[in-house]
């Protein structure tokens, strides 16, 4: 179902009796959002407003929103906490996450019985231990790890690292990487928190990360050491919308 299609989404609410919604439906490529902002504003915000409106109408009480650490913009200090002020986002993608958080906050404040949690992901990474679920995207990857693994497997000739002139120890961007299994467990815990009414407020925010930043080069070198191989990579210019560290 296209969640931008209100009529189609309404039929889902009419057919199924569910109390909680986890909202993942969004485009997420920072660079693409800079080139095609309207695509991101339409898909990421119109769909979310449809979900919120129907939850209000049908009396569905719990919504978990997939947010992002991009809402912190270019933070002044690391690590960021939930009390760190949001700063202007550096991309339309980040803007959509900030705006959706505001929408959810306002809806939870206005509509009695509606509860929401926003999980601010840092950088999901890895695969399920079964190896049956992992990062092998169709088309062009939007995350670093698939580029690394595809380069290692010979599917890509070279790995591009965007910028080595940032004010970081090795000049490449710093990111906080969170294992996807831990991220999945965080969603289960958040839904349980809502359904068991353990929330302190109708709307809450939680960061989902480790608190330890790793540079792009550190990740590449770590992959090389763990697998006993050398990756073919090159340094290219900075990518629009990227922040130095988060």
Question: Each predicted region: which residue ranges?
Answer:
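Rossmann-fold scaffold of SDR-type NAD(P)-dependent oxidoreductases
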Residues: 18-24, 65, 207
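A hydrophobic alpha-helix adjacent to the NAD(P)-binding/active-site core of NAD(P)-dependent oxidoreductases
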Residues: 12, 40-41, 55
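Conserved Rossmann-fold NAD(P)-dependent oxidoreductase catalytic core, especially the SDR/UDP-sugar
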Residues: 23, 49-92, 107-117
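Active-site Tyr-X1-5-Lys
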Residues: 74, 90-127, 146-156
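Short-chain dehydrogenase/reductase
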Residues: 41, 89-98, 134-146, 176-177, ...
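Conserved Rossmann-fold cofactor-binding substructure of NAD(P)-dependent oxidoreductases
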Residues: 1-20
């Amino acid at each position: 179902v296209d969640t931008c299609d209100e009529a189609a989404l309404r039929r889902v609410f009419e057919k199924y009796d569910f109390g909680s919604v986890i909202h993942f439906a969004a485009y997420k490529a920072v660079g693409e959002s800079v080139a095609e902002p309207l695509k991101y504003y339409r898909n990421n915000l119109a769909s979310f407003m449809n979900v919120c409106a129907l939850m209000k109408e049908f009396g569905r009480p719990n919504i978990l929103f997939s947010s992002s650490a991009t809402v912190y913009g270019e933070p002044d200090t690391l690590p960021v906490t939930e009390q760190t002020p949001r700063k202007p986002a550096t991309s339309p993608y980040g803007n959509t996450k900030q705006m959706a958080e505001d929408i959810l906050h306002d809806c939870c404040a206005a509509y009695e019985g509606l509860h929401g949690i926003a999980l601010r992901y840092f950088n999901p990474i890895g695969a399920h231990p079964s190896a049956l679920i992992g990062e092998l995207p169709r088309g062009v990857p939007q995350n670093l790890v698939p580029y690394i693994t595809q380069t290692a497997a010979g599917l890509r000739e070279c790995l591009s690292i965007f910028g080595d002139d940032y004010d970081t120890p090795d000049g490449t961007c710093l990111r906080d990487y969170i294992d996807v299994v831990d991220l999945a467990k965080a969603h289960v815990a958040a839904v349980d928190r809502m359904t068991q009414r353990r929330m302190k407020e109708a709307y809450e925010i939680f960061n989902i990360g480790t608190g330890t930043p790793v540079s792009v080069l550190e990740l590449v070198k770590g992959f090389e050491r763990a697998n006993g191989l050398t990756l073919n990579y090159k340094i290219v210019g900075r990518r629009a919308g990227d922040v130095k560290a988060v």
